[in-house]
Curated annotation (Swiss-Prot):
It comes from Perisphaeria ruficornis (Cockroach). Belongs to the periviscerokinin family. Keywords: Amidation, Neuropeptide, Secreted. Pfam families: Periviscerokin. One of its GO terms (cellular component) is extracellular region. Its main location: secreted. It comes from the Eukaryota. The modification Valine amide is found at residue 11. This is Periviscerokinin-3. InterPro entries: Periviscerokinin. Mediates visceral muscle contractile activity (myotropic activity). It is found in: Secreted.
Length: 11
């Protein structure tokens, strides 16, 4: 759930 260039899933 990162709001950066690359959105990562919240694990």
């Amino acid at each position: 759930g990162s709001s950066g260039l690359i959105p990562f899933p919240r694990v």
